[in-house]
From Swiss-Prot:
Family that this chain belongs to: Belongs to the WzzB/Cld/Rol family.
Keywords tagged on the record: Cell inner membrane, Cell membrane, Lipopolysaccharide biosynthesis, Membrane, Transmembrane, Transmembrane helix
Name of this chain's protein: Chain length determinant protein
Cited NCBIfam families: PRK15471.1 (NF012015)
Pfam families per record: Wzz
Molecular function per GO: protein tyrosine kinase activity
Alphabetized InterPro entries for the sequence: Bact_polysacc_biosynth/exp, LPS_length_determ_N_term
Principal localisation: membrane
Length: 326
């Protein structure tokens, strides 16, 4: 009984089980179909690689400009604002900030145009504002490198133009303020001179009325007041009036400092300033590997997909034959 049971169990096959050897035999017999499927898939992959647009990414790293790059701009700001001028470090941060904003705006514009272009700017190190990594995706390696350099220069020129315009506006405003200050000080000095002459003329009237022709006191600034000025005598007072009338206006040191500031501002030549809002840490690189399409990966996937499709055709065809035979 035990032997018979063993024989029966050994001959009992489950029809639902997959016979791997049988599958391999079927695939081997249908190898030409699989090979043809793989060849077709490879041909399609090669066709795709031939017509697909290549993508190459050129990258550059920038940071805030050096002190030497903004020396002229810093000097102009010192002339315009004097002691209130911003520090060099503040100017550096402001310039790279304006460059980053203008670059981001350009990237947004390129992304929204009909034929999109991918231009990006982002921090090189996470949680650090500087340096910045800028990149451009082009259809050729040389084109991506050239375009990135072109857009960086374009943004720098734009920022430069904006800074020159701001400087010209600030120079015009500073010149007007200084000219107004000079006019005010000149008016005050003229009024002081006129007041002095009127005071002497009034003292001369008193001296004539008192018939004082000769000095009755020593002429010292500490002793003489408006009330005792007539004691200098009419002769001295008449001479003083003539002297005061031809005497140039007397100004404070602040007046001459204001004039010097005005001359300095008027001598500024904004058009000659060469302002750069950034400095290269790494210039636009020439990419050596394209982003897409990847030839090796595409061909490998084509072989795998072609093989899978071919195997599916072989197994499906055999399954259909077996079904029809039943």
């Amino acid at each position: 009984m035990r032997v018979e049971n063993n024989n029966v169990s050994g001959q009992n096959h489950d029809p639902e089980q997959i016979d791997l050897i049988d599958l391999l035999v079927q695939l081997w017999r249908g190898k030409m179909t699989i090979i043809i499927s793989v060849i077709v898939a490879i041909a399609l992959a090669i066709g795709y690689l031939a017509v697909a647009k290549e993508k190459w990414t050129s990258t550059a790293i920038i940071t805030q400009p050096d002190v030497g790059q903004i020396a002229g701009y810093n000097n102009a700001m010192n002339v315009i604002y004097g002691q209130a001028a911003p520090k060099v470090s503040d100017l550096q941060e402001t310039l790279i900030g304006r460059f980053s904003s203008a670059f981001s705006a350009l990237a947004e514009t390129l992304d929204n145009q009909e034929e999109r272009e991918k231009l990006t700017i982002e921090p090189s190190v996470k949680n650090q504002q500087l340096p910045l990594t800028v990149s451009y995706v082009g259809q050729t390696a040389e084109g991506a490198q050239m375009k990135l350099a072109q857009y960086i220069q374009q943004v720098d020129d734009k920022v430069n133009q904006e800074l020159e315009k701001d400087l010209k506006d600030n120079i015009a405003l500073g010149r007007k303020n200084l000219q107004d200050s000079l006019r005010t000080q000149e008016v005050v000095a003229q009024e002081q001179k006129d007041l002095r002459i009127r005071q002497i003329q009034e003292a001369l009237q008193y001296a004539n009325q008192a018939q004082v022709t000769k000095p009755q006191i020593q002429q010292t600034g500490e002793d003489i007041t408006q009330d005792t000025l007539f004691l200098l005598g009419s002769e001295a007072l008449e001479s003083m009036i003539k002297h005061e009338a031809t005497r140039p206006l007397v100004f404070s040191p602040n007046y001459y400092q204001t004039r010097q500031n005005l001359l300095d501002i008027e001598s500024l030549k904004v058009d000659d300033l060469d302002i750069h809002a950034y400095r290269y840490v790494m210039k636009p690189m020439l990419p050596i590997r394209r982003d897409s399409p990847k030839k090796a990966i595409t061909l490998i996937l084509a072989v795998l997909l072609g093989g899978m499709v071919g195997a599916g055709i072989v197994l499906g065809r055999n399954a259909l034959r077996n079904y029809n035979a039943k």
